[in-house]
Structure formats: structure tokens, C-alpha cells
């Protein structure tokens, strides 16, 4: 119905096969963080509102916004996609199950709470991913213990 229902934030730190891309960015995150960044959600929402207003269309579906910070820490949107990020399962492991949310919405599940919810993650939560294996969710402080 054109309303934001769910949101979450994550950070890509390192990338799978980063040496094959001139920029070092492949889009497939090998090491990332689950974040609590309501300001980024507000910026993404503002950008989406502007885009939909400019195209005279109604918001519908799943969207992701990618940001990159400048040297002063100011975030800028680099792209907006109409799909989930590759590390969506890492979000689910952290409690933000967007796939389940979408199924509930599409099936008009009467028990689904359509009130806006920004998923909140335990601070310091990271994920590790590689090709053909399930991601690992852990505390960043535990990474040095391995």
C-alpha cells in the first residue's frame, strides 16, 4: 500500500573474490556487520519517496539502498535495487526474516503486523560468508578469539 513496513541495516566490509574486480567490490560480502542505523533508513526512505514522486508511481515491493561514506563520514546513496541483498540469510539469522515477511504480506496473513518495524540487532554482530557454505553469525569481539 505504498508504506514502509520493515527495515534493517547492514555493512559490507570485505567481499568474496574481491581481487577479480578492479574496485575490489564484487557485491558478494564475505565479512559484514548487522547494524542499527535509523538515520540510513530515513535517508533511503527520503530517496525512495523522491523517486516514486518523480515517476508518479506507488511504492510496492522490496527495495535496498546502498550507501558509501565520504572521507568525512557522510553517507551517499550509490544505488537502489528492487531485490534483497546477497546476505539476506544473514539478516534472517539475526532476526530480520524478510523472506518470511514477504510471504506473510503476499498471502494476506491476518496475523502479520503491518506496523512499521526496524529490525534491531545485538550490537557488535557480524556475519562471515563464503561460496557454497551457510553464513556464520557471531560477535565481532569473538572473531579475534578464533
Where are the regions that the model predicts?
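Conserved metal-phosphate-binding beta-hairpin within the catalytic cores
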Residues: 52-89
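ATP-dependent carboxylate/phosphate-activation module, predominantly the ATP-grasp catalytic core
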Residues: 1-52, 81-106
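Residue-level preference for alpha-helix termini and adjacent loops
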Residues: 61-62, 83-92, 97, 120, ...
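Short beta-strand element of the conserved SAM-dependent methyltransferase core
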Residues: 24, 30, 67, 137-139
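A sequence-level detector of short, solvent-exposed, charge-rich linear segments
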Residues: 28, 59, 63, 67, ...
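Phosphate-binding glycine-rich loops and adjacent basic patches that engage nucleotide phosphates
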Residues: 1-12, 60-68, 141-146
Amino acid at each position: 500500500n505504498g508504506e514502509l513496513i520493515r527495515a534493517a541495516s547492514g555493512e559490507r566490509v570485505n567481499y568474496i573474490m574481491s581481487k577479480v574486480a578492479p574496485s575490489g567490490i564484487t557485491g558478494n560480502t564475505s565479512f559484514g556487520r548487522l547494524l542499527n542505523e535509523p538515520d540510513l533508513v530515513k535517508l533511503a526512505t527520503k530517496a525512495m519517496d523522491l523517486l516514486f514522486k518523480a515517476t508518479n508511481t506507488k511504492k510496492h515491493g522490496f527495495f535496498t539502498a546502498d550507501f558509501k561514506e565520504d572521507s568525512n563520514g557522510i553517507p551517499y546513496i550509490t544505488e537502489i535495487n528492487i531485490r534483497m541483498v546477497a546476505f539476506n540469510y544473514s539478516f534472517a539469522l539475526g532476526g530480520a526474516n524478510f523472506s518470511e515477511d514477504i510471504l506473510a504480506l503476499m498471502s494476506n496473513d491476518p496475523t502479520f503486523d503491518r506496523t512499521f518495524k526496524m529490525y534491531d540487532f545485538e550490537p557488535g554482530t557480524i556475519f562471515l560468508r563464503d561460496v557454497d557454505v551457510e553464513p556464520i553469525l557471531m560477535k565481532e569481539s569473538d572473531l579475534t578469539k578464533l
